[in-house]
């Protein structure tokens, strides 16, 4: 037992000796180690105290600064905190139907502020000043719209009535014009072969370029044919030249002896015109018309067909009137003398008219046809 105890003590001594063997080798380091411990402890304590002091001082400064600020703003902060807690707690419940005035917490904002219920907006504004009572019923938007619609309808009815009156007036005027034309249209020249029957003197049959007849040629003997009468065809026509003496004969111009004759429509139909009959140019004047003191006058609408012209005979413009064809008239023999009428560029070779006085001025007898060879353009 003693041996074991001695061995153990020896081992402990060895371990302890090994621990301090460094100092045994360097024994002068032992006092320095003590100094080092003191220095390290002091430095550590200073650092620790420094951090602690900074922390404490920071907190102290924070307290010193925040406390007066809190005191200054407390009148605002405290009500704000109270309102926030009230709203967050949800104390503003609805009034109970059984006991509406039992708890003041039913309207928390008013109860907290102490505002009595008698000065609520619904109680302040009287019913007499409410918008529903201020605006009378007659000025409501629905009534205004109805009035506007009524006025617009009245204006439209007035405009329609005026238009109808104007249309009636125009129809009456047109009917009067037609009556006049019908009453004055019958150009009955009984003396179709009298001494002063001028036909085609200075007359232009075309668009002002080719003249139909000489300036002073008298056609037949008898009453004036086409003197101062007006024949106006309202429509468009290609042959717009003048034909006739005294009275102008146009497809869109004037022709007739006596009263006015105006056809309301376009001259699309062949009307008849003679010194002894009626002159109506109401239809499409597409076919050849006849014109003579004893015959009929049918004017071509665009003067596209051959019109015949002559007293007793026929004066037929075989080409287009308004086109390029030359008008060559065929006449009937009346007396003994034959002559050729040269007009413009074309020769009226077929018009073998017998002149009563033998002159070449176109003063032909009753039955002679006046066929001029000028081109009708």
UniProtKB/Swiss-Prot annotation:
Compartments (UniProt record): Lipid droplet; Membrane
One GO term describing the cellular component: monolayer-surrounded lipid storage body
Region (4 X 18 AA tandem repeats of K-H-E-S-G-G-[SA]-[PSA]-M-G-G-G-K-H-G-S-[GE]-G): 230-313
Alphabetical keyword list: Lipid droplet, Membrane, Repeat, Transmembrane, Transmembrane helix
Compositional bias segments (type: Low complexity): 350-369
Ranges of compositional bias, category Basic and acidic residues: 162-185, 195-231, 247-263
Transmembrane segments: 16-36, 38-58, 69-89
GO biological process, one term: post-embryonic development
Stretch list, region Disordered: 158-377
Ranges where the record places region 3 X 5 AA tandem repeats of S-S-D-G-S: 355-368
Superkingdom, taxonomy of origin: Eukaryota
Keyword flag Repeat: yes
Annotated stretches, region: 3 X 10 AA tandem repeats of I-P-E-[SG]-I-K-P-S-N-[IV]: 115-144
Membrane topology, from the record: Multi-pass membrane protein
Composition bias type Gly residues, residue spans: 232-244, 280-292, 302-314
Region of interest: 3 X 6 AA tandem repeats of E-[SD]-[KT]-H-G-[KS]-G: 196-222
Chain spans, region Hydrophobic: 38-133
Sequence repeats: 115-124, 125-134, 135-144, 196-202, 204-208, 209-215, 216-222, 230-247, 260-277, 278-295, 296-313, 355-359, 360-363, 364-368
Organ and tissue specificity: The full-length protein is found in the tapetal lipid bodies of immature anthers, the proteolytically cleaved C-terminal product is found on the coats of pollen grains. No expression is detected in other flower organs, siliques or seedlings.
Residues covered by region (Polar): 1-37
Coiled coil: none
Function as written in the Swiss-Prot or TrEMBL entry: Many of the major pollen coat proteins are derived from endoproteolytic cleavage of oleosin-like proteins.
Similarity annotation: Belongs to the oleosin family.
Name of the protein described by the UniProt record: Oleosin-B4
């Amino acid at each position: 037992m003693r041996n074991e105890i001695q061995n153990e003590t020896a081992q402990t001594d060895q371990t302890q000796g090994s621990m301090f063997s460094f100092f045994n080798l360097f024994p002068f380091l032992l006092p320095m180690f003590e100094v080092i411990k003191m220095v390290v402890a002091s430095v550590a304590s200073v650092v620790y105290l420094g951090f602690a002091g900074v922390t404490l001082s920071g907190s102290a400064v924070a307290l010193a600064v925040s406390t007066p600020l809190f005191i200054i703003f407390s009148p605002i902060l405290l009500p704000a905190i109270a309102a926030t807690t009230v709203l967050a707690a949800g104390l503003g419940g609805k009034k109970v139907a059984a006991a509406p005035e039992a708890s003041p917490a039913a309207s928390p904002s008013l109860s907290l502020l102490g505002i009595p219920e008698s000065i609520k907006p619904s109680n302040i504004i009287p019913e007499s000043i409410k918008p529903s009572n201020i605006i009378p019923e007659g000025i409501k938007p629905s009534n205004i719209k109805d009035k506007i619609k009524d006025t617009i309808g009245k204006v439209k009815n007035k405009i329609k009535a005026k238009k109808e009156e104007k249309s009636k007036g125009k129809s009456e005027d047109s009917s009067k014009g037609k009556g006049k034309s019908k009453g004055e249209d019958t150009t009955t020249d009984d003396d179709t072969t009298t001494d002063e029957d001028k036909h085609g003197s200075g007359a232009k049959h075309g668009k002002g370029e080719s003249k139909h007849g000489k300036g002073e040629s008298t056609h037949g003997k008898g009453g004036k044919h086409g003197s101062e009468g007006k024949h106006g065809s309202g429509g468009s026509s290609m042959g717009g030249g003048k034909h006739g003496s005294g009275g102008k004969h146009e497809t869109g111009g004037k022709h007739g002896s006596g009263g006015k004759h105006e056809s309301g429509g376009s001259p699309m139909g062949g009307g008849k015109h003679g010194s002894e009959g009626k002159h109506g140019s109401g239809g499409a004047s597409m076919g050849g018309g006849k014109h003579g003191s004893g015959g009929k006058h049918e004017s071509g609408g665009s003067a596209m067909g051959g019109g015949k012209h002559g007293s007793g005979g026929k004066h037929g413009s075989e080409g287009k009137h308004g086109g390029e064809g030359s008008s060559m008239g065929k006449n009937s023999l009346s007396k003994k003398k034959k002559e050729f009428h040269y007009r413009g560029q074309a020769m009226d070779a077929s018009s073998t008219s017998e002149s009563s006085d033998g002159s070449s001025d176109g003063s032909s007898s009753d039955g002679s046809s006046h066929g001029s060879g000028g081109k009708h353009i």
